[in-house]
């Protein structure tokens, strides 16, 4: 592909960057951006069907830039080819005097929200964008938070007083004006539309999430998702926390996923540090990840059934989830957010009784799952409410950057654990459930149930084949180092003290890790400048892409169908807003 780009656009228009990424990174000039991206999408040899991620970088305080093109800011386009299982990253350098790029939202539909986020966080303008407004920050916010000259400490700001004038401005910004959202008041027959706020505090919106609905009678003509109510500045926080002390924050990106969220961050840091962990560490990480996957899927399954009108499954599923939490707590000492993975290993070795607790759960859960299928999933009302509802195909899924069960329901056989195995998943025997070309609400639920069965299969293999050995690498950047190492000599004690107080110094470079998270593909793109903190931490979450697709899927349906659709997506707003 790179040779084809050189031949078509001229080698002099590209700069190849070295990194720890398996994917090539090409810097290109903004004048050929649209042509290059159009070629990547339509190329017959290797088509990059998915714009996987799109994010900005403030380069102004970065020291280790090697021979990179001169840039104050950089915009990175991460393309993903499902058919060839390959990636390509394009970077465009920008100077602060000209922070403008052409929008690519007409080529990749999902670029819309990503470009809005970049403008929101960095102030980079995308010309001809259909709706370039703030997306995560309040509309009356001043400044662009991910710029390096925007402080991450509240103590460095002036004192804040919420005056009556500020309150009025805040309330005014929340008022709904259809035209400002690109919506018409009347149809072609001059019939007036009704506009309805669904959320941000509706029980079926699954979090602080607002959808503005344009209705003609009961039919949804259009809708606009409004996100950002749960934004906590997770990427900004990473710039002030050490590589080690940021681990607890990863748990809370998708707060149901627990250790699953820690996996991509830890693996990306270990790539930067050059750490290879023992086999036992890999299997322990898989053990915890699959427990959390089942836990998350059970909540999804039970709340989906509840949204349709049946309450029993919620109470039953929470009994099962309690058993999982008891098992997780016995291993990690915590329940929802254990922050248990470490750079170079895990926090502790497995306790003595871990296998007996896991064995009991593996006996219990399969029968319980069959029970849910019989009492709810085969129910005629549930089938009629969800089968054929909110349906889309492979082309639409790829256009919107859909991953996970939503994509696999369209017949695309892609699971990161199988196609790009990490942490030793290549040593496990399990199947990837896929659908039959159309992803509707019912199919997405069926796939999640089958994914639980496959996770149980993986857990059984962890039980039977847990390796012997250490729970932590001997690498000097493993944090914290083993106690017997740090207590052996005063010099090593000093190293331990520095790593835990100031943080480990990670070599300068860039790394990337994607994983199959509970709700789709989650990834971390890390940039180290050779310091104890990350220079840039980019968190790509599946739910951000999934919610952007809502208007294209739900037009023509009614509100009750919207509730079924939202329940079938499987999202939490912390995963969307970060």
UniProtKB/Swiss-Prot annotation:
Gene Ontology CC entries for this record: NADH dehydrogenase complex; plasma membrane
Keyword Signal: no
Alphabetic keyword roster: Cell inner membrane, Cell membrane, Membrane, Multifunctional enzyme, NAD, Quinone, Translocase, Transport, Ubiquinone
Stated name of the protein: NADH-quinone oxidoreductase subunit C/D
Keyword NAD found: yes
Highest taxon above the source species: Bacteria
Task of the protein: NDH-1 shuttles electrons from NADH, via FMN and iron-sulfur (Fe-S) centers, to quinones in the respiratory chain. The immediate electron acceptor for the enzyme in this species is believed to be ubiquinone. Couples the redox reaction to proton translocation (for every two electrons transferred, four hydrogen ions are translocated across the cytoplasmic membrane), and thus conserves the redox energy in a proton gradient.
Protein family per UniProt: In the N-terminal section; belongs to the complex I 30 kDa subunit family.
Record-listed E.C. numbers: 7.1.1.-
Chief localization: membrane
Upper lineage: Bacteria, Pseudomonadati, Pseudomonadota, Gammaproteobacteria, Enterobacterales
Membrane topology, as annotated: Peripheral membrane protein
Pfam families: Complex1_30kDa, Complex1_49kDa
Annotated region described as NADH dehydrogenase I subunit D, given as residue ranges: 192-578
Known catalytic reactions: a quinone + NADH + 5 H(+)(in) = a quinol + NAD(+) + 4 H(+)(out)
Chain residue ranges for the region called NADH dehydrogenase I subunit C: 1-167
GO MF, one example: quinone binding
Self-association state and partner proteins as the record states: NDH-1 is composed of 13 different subunits. Subunits NuoB, CD, E, F, and G constitute the peripheral sector of the complex.
Compartment(s) where it occurs, according to its Swiss-Prot or TrEMBL record: Cell inner membrane
Enzyme class: translocase
InterPro entries in UniProt: NADH_DH_suC, NADH_DH_suCD, NADH_Q_OxRdtase_suD, NADH_quin_OxRdtase_su_C/D-like, NADH_UbQ_OxRdtase_30kDa_su, NADH_UbQ_OxRdtase_49kDa_CS, NDH1_su_D/H, NiFe-Hase_large
């Amino acid at each position: 592909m790179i040779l084809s780009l050189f031949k078509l656009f001229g080698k002099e228009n590209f700069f190849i960057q070295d990194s720890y990424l398996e994917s090539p990174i090409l810097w290109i000039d903004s004048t050929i951006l649209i042509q290059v991206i159009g070629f990547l999408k339509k190329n017959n040899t290797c088509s990059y069907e998915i714009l996987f991620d799109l994010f900005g970088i403030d380069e102004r305080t970065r020291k280790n830039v090697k021979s990179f093109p001169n840039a104050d800011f950089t915009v990175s386009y991460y393309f993903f080819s499902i058919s060839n299982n390959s990636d390509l990253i394009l970077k465009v350098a920008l100077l602060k005097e000209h922070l403008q790029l052409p929008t690519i939202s007409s080529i990749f539909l999902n670029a819309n929200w990503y470009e809005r986020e970049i403008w929101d966080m960095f102030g980079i303008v995308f010309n001809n964008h259909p709706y370039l407004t703030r997306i995560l920050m309040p509309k009356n916010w001043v400044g662009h938070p991910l710029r390096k000259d925007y402080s991450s400490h509240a103590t460095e700001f002036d004192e804040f007083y919420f005056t009556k004038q500020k309150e009025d401005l805040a309330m005014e910004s929340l008022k709904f004006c259809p035209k400002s959202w690109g919506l018409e008041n009347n149809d072609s027959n001059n019939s007036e539309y009704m506009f309805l706020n669904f959320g941000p505090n509706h029980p079926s919106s699954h979090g602080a999430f607002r959808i503005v609905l344009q209705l003609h009678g009961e039919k949804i003509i259009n809708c606009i998702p409004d996100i950002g109510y749960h934004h906590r500045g997770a990427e900004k926080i990473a710039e002030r926390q050490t590589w080690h002390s940021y681990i607890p924050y990863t748990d809370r990106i998708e707060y149901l996923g627990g250790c699953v969220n820690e996996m991509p961050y830890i693996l990306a840091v270990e790539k930067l540090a050059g750490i290879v962990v023992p086999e036992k560490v890999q299997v322990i990480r898989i053990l915890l990840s699959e427990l959390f996957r089942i836990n998350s899927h059970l909540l999804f399954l039970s709340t989906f059934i509840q949204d349709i009108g049946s309450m029993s499954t919620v109470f039953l599923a929470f009994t099962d989830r309690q058993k999982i939490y008891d098992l997780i707590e016995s291993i990690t000492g915590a329940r929802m957010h254990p922050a248990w993975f470490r750079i170079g290993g895990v926090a502790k070795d497995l306790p003595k009784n871990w296998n007996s607790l896991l064995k009991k759960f593996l006996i219990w859960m399969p029968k319980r799952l069959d029970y849910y299928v019989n009492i709810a999933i085969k129910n005629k009302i549930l089938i009629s409410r969800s089968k054929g509802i909110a349906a889309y195909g492979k082309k639409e899924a790829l256009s919107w950057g859909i991953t996970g069960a939503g994509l696999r329901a369209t017949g695309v056989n892609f699971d990161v654990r199988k196609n790009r195995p990490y942490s030793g998943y290549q040593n496990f025997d399990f199947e990837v459930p896929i659908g039959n070309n159309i992803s509707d609400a019912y199919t997405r639920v069926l796939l999640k149930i089958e994914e639980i069965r496959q996770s149980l299969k993986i857990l059984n293999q962890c039980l039977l084949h847990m390796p012997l050995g250490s729970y932590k690498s001997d690498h000097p950047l493993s944090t914290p180092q083993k106690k017997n190492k740090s207590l052996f000599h005063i010099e090593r004690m000093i190293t331990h003290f520095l790593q835990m107080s100031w943080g480990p110094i990670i070599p300068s470079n860039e790394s990337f890790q994607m994983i199959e998270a509970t709700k789709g593909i989650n990834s971390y793109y890390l940039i180290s400048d050779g310091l104890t903190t990350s220079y840039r931490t980019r968190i790509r979450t599946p739910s951000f892409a999934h919610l952007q697709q809502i208007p294209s899927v739900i037009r023509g349906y009614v509100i009750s169908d919207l509730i079924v659709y939202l329940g079938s997506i499987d999202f939490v707003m912390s995963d969307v807003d970060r």
